[in-house]
Amino acid sequence: YFIKTIHDVPSIVLIFFFYYVVFAAVQVGGIFVCIVALGVYTSGSFIKVIDIGLSQVDANQHYAAQMLGLSGWKKYRYVILPQAVKPMIPLFAAESKVLLRATTYAGYISQMDLVKVTEMIRKETYDMLVPLVFVSIVFLILSKLIVISLDAIYKKAFNYD
């Protein structure tokens, strides 16, 4: 129930909830609140991804591991997880990109993030095009790095495909 509730709430609402309700009595920075709020939000998403990956493994694989006499940990380590990780990697990449985009909400409660700096540059120079193009390129590069990293992990882990 917790995971479904957290995942159904928009990340910006969760950030505001943590900033104005959970951490209202404590003086903490907005960046810290964003890290905690987005960590909670992302953990719900990642748990769903793990659940999807584990559900993809056929029940007969569990029985086969038991028949081989593998303990609970060894069953998951050698039989279940190698098969479950493969469908998880693209989903982790997608969720990581969603998390990257959600970090732009940090500017609503903190003083410094990339989008907030862009706004400050616009106020000083009256030019919005160059800062927005720069921020877009930075986010594009970060997004591509996520995809390239997870692709490398995928290829290294499953080089037999």
Question: Where is each model-derived feature located?
Answer:
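Transmembrane alpha-helices and adjacent helix-loop boundaries
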Residues: 1-161
